[in-house]
């Protein structure tokens, strides 16, 4: 079931049965997953764990909101305890908004001693993509967490720090 459909169903239950429902819209949640996870961010983290170069299969221009798993959990608790019934709260750390390319670069830069390089499957993707901002352009994958922060939530894990934590956990699990 889609996210919006779930929210509509929740709104119906609030109206029909008076249920107390809190709604969260999380960004891309990242953290220590598994080394075989096929999500792109998880593949980049696995590359760092395995000390392998990162290969992008596109120009990596897609913009995303990311939020480390512990920040996401604390945000959900904040919404549960202080959020308005039936009101959706976006969970994102604006300082972690980046492109897929940016996530890959951050993963490489988080461990400079490993000399992990970023490469591209297609040479035409190597040039830094131009991301045009126009009044008509929208970025549905970028979330605004202003309402959540108004409840007192404060994210604390930067993208680089989150990648370092995830790598550390995976290395400990795979010894």
Question: What is each of the regions a protein language model found here?
Answer:
Residues 1-7, 38-42, 65-66, 97, ...:
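Short-chain dehydrogenase/reductase
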Residues 1-22, 49-50:
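Active-site Tyr-X1-5-Lys
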Residues 5, 9, 13, 44, ...:
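Hydrophobic alpha-helix immediately C-terminal to the catalytic Tyr-X-X-X-Lys motif of short-chain
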Residues 48-175:
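C-terminal substrate-binding subdomain of Rossmann-fold SDR/epimerase-dehydratase oxidoreductases
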Residues 10, 32-38, 78, 97, ...:
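Active-site-proximal flexible loops/turns
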Residues 3, 25, 32, 64, ...:
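Short, cationic motifs built from Arg/Lys/His that form the positively charged side of catalytic pockets
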Residues 19-40:
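Flexible, glycine-rich beta-alpha linker
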